[in-house]
Amino acid sequence: MRQRRSAPARAEARDEVVTLETADGAVDHAPRASWENLRGPSRTLAACVAATRPKSLTAAVIPFAVGTSLACADGPPRWPHAVPALASFVLMQIGCNLVNDACDFTRGADGPNRTGPTRVSQAGVFRARNVHLCGAACLALAAAAMAPAALDLQYDGTPGGVFSGEVGETQWSVVVLTASSVLAAYAYTGGPYPLGYHALGECTVFVFFGVVAVALARRAHSGPPSRCHDSDASATLRALRDLRHTLCDLDALVAGAQTGALACALLAVNNLRDARSDAAAKKNTLAVRYGTAFAKREIDALMAVAFVLAWYWWLTRVGVGERGDDGVATTNEPSSRTVARRWSYASTAPCLAVPLALSVSRRARALEPGHKDCDATLAAAAALHFAFGGLLALGVAHDAKTKAREA
């Protein structure tokens, strides 16, 4: 793709459209970012906000909402621990975005021929090194924000949740998962082996912005499991039990897989849009390595995974595959009356997002890298992730409360 401007490289702020000429001669008109039309401090402030990519922050909020809904079955919420955890998730997403902004520009992925919104490092508003440092600082703050849950800080139990200053036993599962999430957020495009440049972006997003995020959110609310506090066991054994309990929570795994799959679909649309410029910068995403046809099938498959896994909630709700206190699955066949009484909203509510998923699939099939409709498809994929995750959270919370009333 060759960029052609009617003005010099740094176009005047009044110019609202950038003309791009593709390799086949087609011309796309990419709208300039709104902050580029501003001047002075207003432009700087707007660029700071744009650098955080506010529209992407739902990728941090949705796993927290789903994990919070799962925690409804564990007892009263622990908001003094959960609210800092939400702040940690948001800071982690912002830090990942800033590091991505700086590193993609440094490595040439965000060059003059880039499609999509203008990045602040690419536009020269801020030095890439400073953007990188701000991203690292956000990731450090994200780790610090998990301290109340990691240290099990005690509070008085009132709705306001005033901390008493007492520290409980260190929750090693929270420490390990938070540290690994921060490292993954940085290593996505930072460090000596950027995961996003080696076709590992979707895998990273699925694990850390899906499964791990949901598990951490639930754990922040529910606190340490009682069976991990065996006074006769060593501290190391209790820590291992704690980590196993958090990672082997089947409900959190399934919910995390659903939200993670749609976050991956969002990333796959983004990589399809940028496939041409990524290939030129040797950023080997799955769309670059296996082609655009594969990327389109990948988007469909990831969306299908999220909806197919909804059956899990129906099966566990009616009693098929339920686990007893000993962790062993039950095998009793549910009666028709039981099925009617235990209908799962967690399995049906997300189905309201099916039309949106079909729209994303139809749009993605018609896309080619750099096409002017790529950003609209990306917005639709983000809306799907938000709608599906919100409906799943509401359904899980409803099922948990219904089950508590039946108990």
Question: What is each residue range found by the language model?
Answer:
Residues P112-E169, K283-G319, A379-L391:
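Multi-pass membrane catalytic core of lipid/isoprenoid biosynthesis enzymes
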Residues P117-H229, A235-D242:
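Intramembrane alpha-helical segments
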Residues T204-A275, A293-K296, A329:
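Functional transmembrane core segments of multi-pass inner-membrane proteins
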Residues L91-T115, C264-A287:
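Acidic (Asp/Glu-rich) catalytic motifs at the cytosolic membrane interface
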Residues L315-A404:
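Extended hydrophobic alpha-helices typical of membrane-associated regions
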Residues D74-A102, Q171-Y186, L247-V269:
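Membrane-embedded alpha-helical segments that form the functional core of polytopic membrane enzymes
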Residues A65, C203-R218, A379-G390:
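Small-residue-rich segments of transmembrane alpha-helices in multi-pass membrane proteins
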